[in-house]
Amino acid sequence: MTISNYSLLSFLLIGMSFVSCKTQEKNDSMEPIETKVNALENEDWEVDFLDNFESFNTDNWQDQRIWVNNETHCYVPGGAFGTREVSDGSLKLKVVNTGEKRPCDNFDKNGKQHPETQYAAGRIATKNKKEFIKGKWTAKLKLASNGEASMFPAWWLLGAQNNESPVQEPDENICWPLTGSGEIDIFEHHGDHQKDHFTTGAIKSLGECDKGDWWSLRKGFDVTLNEYHEYSVEWEDSDLVYRVDGKEIYRNVGEGDNYPEKMFAILNFAKITDAPMKGEWVMEVDWVKHEFRK
């Protein structure tokens, strides 16, 4: 081998050593980040509430009748008109066109009664049944369609001291959305906007009764609404983390500590505008659970 060939080989060996060192240096610097992520992903959770909807369990849920958001339906108890059904291992909450206008006994927070309506709907809550501080809430659910005008199904949380109907305990005296009556929306579909789309996020309190910022902490995502998905929110340190099928899609950074109170879960299917509908709309829920970190 000539001297020039020896020089070329030495140059190549030195270059390879340099690249190897830099690669090892890069891997060493990344390792703590990867370890931290894996530690969070593998963190154990323990289930302290699970409803698989083999039946409608009144130890877990109660019907709610209230008029909010200028909704055009009437919430009815006991699954009247087929608005709430448990069958084949799942809960079905519905909006039903009954075919004729009927009196409605729902009232808004100012005592105004809902006008007669031909639309009946189901709304249930774990209020005074299953209430938890922080942790993680998840529901596996789907809609019967990809979305229609006026549809407004939701899976969400509300502070346990909320002063809206039904008021059953002395400490239920805090107005929405102040601390104690805060709101976190895990899944909402606004049918007037677009199909196969939902929004998720917290409502930011503006420090007064009935004064909430609906949009600054919320984000919309595409999803196939008529297929089952798992929608969740969890408290991670001071953040609220939103997931679909276990994958993080959104995060309210630093907002978790603004919701320190016990919260209960709500499932409801609303009709939000005067747009006509026929037959029934269905939200099907396979299960609901709450977990806490061990």
Descriptions of predicted regions:
Residues 1-8:
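Bacterial N-terminal signal peptides that target proteins for export
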Residues 12-13:
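Hydrophobic helical h-region of N-terminal Sec-dependent signal peptides
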Residues 17-20:
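C-terminal motif of bacterial Sec signal peptides marking the signal peptidase cleavage site
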Residues 25-294:
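GH16 jelly-roll
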